[in-house]
C-alpha cells in the first residue's frame, strides 16, 4: 500500500471533465498485515516499508501467535516470506494448523476481498503519511461487521461454523 492511493474513477456533471489533485512528491510504501476470522479482523499491524522475512517473522511471533487458539487454521499464500521454517514452527506450536493456497489462486483467499474494500476506503480518505494510514486503519477495520467477514470466508468456498 502506498501513500499515493487515488480513486481510479470519478463523476462530473455532463459536459465537464472530472479532475482532481494528484500528489507529485515521492510516495511512501506501507505494509498492512492482518488475519481474518469469520467474525472479525484480528492481529492487524501496519509496517512502515515493504514486507521482508524479518518483519513477517516478528509479526507472526509477536502479533499473530498470541491471537491463535488451538485448532485454528492459518491460510497463507505462496509469498516467499511465508515459507520460513521459524514461522511454521511458531504457528504449529500455538496449536494451529498451517495451510498454503495453491499458486496463483487469490479466489481462495478471503482477505483479498476484504483488502479491496479497505483500499477503496483509504483511496477516498487519501492518507499521505504513515500516521494517517494507521489512524485510518483503525477507523476502516471498524466498518467490517461479523456477517461481512463470514461472507468473505464463505464466498471463497470455506464453511463457516454457526
Would you name each region that the model predicts?
Residues 1-162:
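Short functional hotspots at interaction and active-site rims
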Amino acid at each position: 500500500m502506498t501513500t499515493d492511493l487515488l480513486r481510479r474513477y470519478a463523476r462530473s456533471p455532463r459536459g465537464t471533465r472530472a479532475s482532481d489533485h494528484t500528489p507529485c512528491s515521492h510516495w511512501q510504501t506501507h505494509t498492512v498485515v492482518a488475519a481474518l476470522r469469520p467474525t472479525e479482523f484480528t492481529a492487524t499491524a501496519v509496517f512502515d516499508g515493504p514486507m521482508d522475512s524479518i518483519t513477517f517473522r516478528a509479526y507472526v511471533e509477536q502479533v499473530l501467535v498470541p491471537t491463535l487458539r488451538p485448532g485454528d487454521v492459518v491460510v497463507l499464500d505462496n509469498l516467499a516470506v511465508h515459507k520460513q521454517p521459524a514461522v511454521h514452527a511458531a504457528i504449529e506450536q500455538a496449536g494451529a494448523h498451517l495451510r498454503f493456497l495453491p499458486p496463483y489462486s487469490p479466489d481462495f483467499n478471503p482477505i483479498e476481498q476484504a483488502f479491496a474494500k479497505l483500499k477503496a476506503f483509504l483511496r477516498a480518505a487519501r492518507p499521505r503519511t504513515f500516521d494517517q494510514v494507521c489512524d485510518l486503519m483503525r477507523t476502516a477495520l471498524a466498518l467490517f461487521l461479523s456477517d461481512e467477514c463470514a461472507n468473505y470466508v464463505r464466498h471463497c468456498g470455506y464453511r463457516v461454523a454457526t
